[in-house]
């Protein structure tokens, strides 16, 4: 894919990073839906930046102010939400769990960021999955190839990350039903196949493995994600929670196996 074919926001992020980070950049990568089966109506644009040093507070502030201007809200195709992650390479070589992230911009943090609270460094199990995904399936926008900067990640580290992330995901179900169901689908798919895929493809795979009472619910989540219908969960809350519990048990069983 030619860089001119990317959404305008991708080139804007590259420009912002080059201006603010200057000589710190080792590589910039596009990953996620954009590099798999294409961006869906509610998809973020996922970008990983690997640097050769930690970020100062002034750099965090400058990055955040600029990204707030170009990142859009969920469902806005013309101005998509951005998820921009910055990692200092020395924090992941050698690999540690949970990995350290220098900075993450995401629309769920907009209120805090607009109030002047800029993303800080943190250790996050989900970063292991992000790194695995970027190493396996990303487009290099600038610098070295991802496999040159991200060490090989054993699959047991992915299982560990899923194990750590599962309780928090389940607890966020109320009000985020579609995303939780689709993320559980992707966890299940990944644990069986040792591959990563988009949420709708994972859901299609999981639907074939569900007891007959559950496929309509997951189909609703999948079709809403694809923009084919509007999903409403209040009237099926009990059944949807039962589906979550069923999927959780399948995932936990897979996590127990070596």
Curated annotation (Swiss-Prot):
Disruption phenotype: Loss of spectinomycin resistance. Pfam families: AadA_C (PF13427), Polbeta (PF18765). SUPFAM superfamilies: Nucleotidyltransferase. Keywords: Antibiotic resistance, Plasmid, Transferase. It comes from the Bacteria. InterPro entries: AadA/Aad9, AadA_C, NT_sf, Polbeta. CDD domains: NT_KNTase_like (cd05403). Mediates bacterial resistance to spectinomycin, is probably a spectinomycin 9-adenylyltransferase. This is Spectinomycin 9-adenylyltransferase. The gene is aad9.
């Amino acid at each position: 894919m030619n860089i001119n074919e990317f959404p305008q926001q991708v080139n804007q992020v590259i420009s912002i990073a080059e201006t603010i980070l200057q000589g710190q950049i080792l590589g910039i990568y596009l990953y996620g839906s954009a590099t798999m089966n294409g961006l869906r109506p509610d998809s973020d644009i996922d970008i990983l930046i690997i640097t050769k040093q930690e970020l100062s507070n002034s750099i965090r502030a400058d990055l955040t102010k600029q990204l707030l201007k170009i990142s859009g809200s969920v469902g806005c195709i013309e101005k998509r939400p951005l998820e921009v992650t910055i990692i200092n390479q020395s924090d992941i070589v050698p690999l540690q769990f949970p990995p350290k992230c220098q900075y993450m911009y995401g629309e769920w943090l907009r209120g805090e960021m607009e109030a002047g609270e800029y993303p800080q460094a943190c250790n996050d199990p989900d970063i292991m999955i992000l790194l695995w995904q970027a190493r396996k399936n990303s487009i290099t926008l600038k610098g070295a190839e991802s496999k040159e900067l991200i060490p090989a990640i054993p699959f047991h580290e992915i299982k560990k990350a899923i194990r750590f992330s599962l309780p928090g995901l389940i607890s966020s179900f109320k009000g985020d039903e579609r995303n939780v169901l689709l993320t559980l689908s992707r966890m299940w798919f990944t644990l069986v196949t040792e591959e990563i895929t988009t949420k709708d493809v994972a859901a299609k795979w999981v639907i074939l493995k569900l007891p007959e009472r559950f496929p309509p619910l997951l189909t609703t989540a999948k079709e809403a994600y694809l923009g084919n219908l509007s999903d409403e969960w209040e009237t099926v809350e009990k059944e949807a929670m039962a589906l979550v519990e069923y999927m959780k048990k399948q995932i936990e069983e897979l996590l127990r196996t070596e």
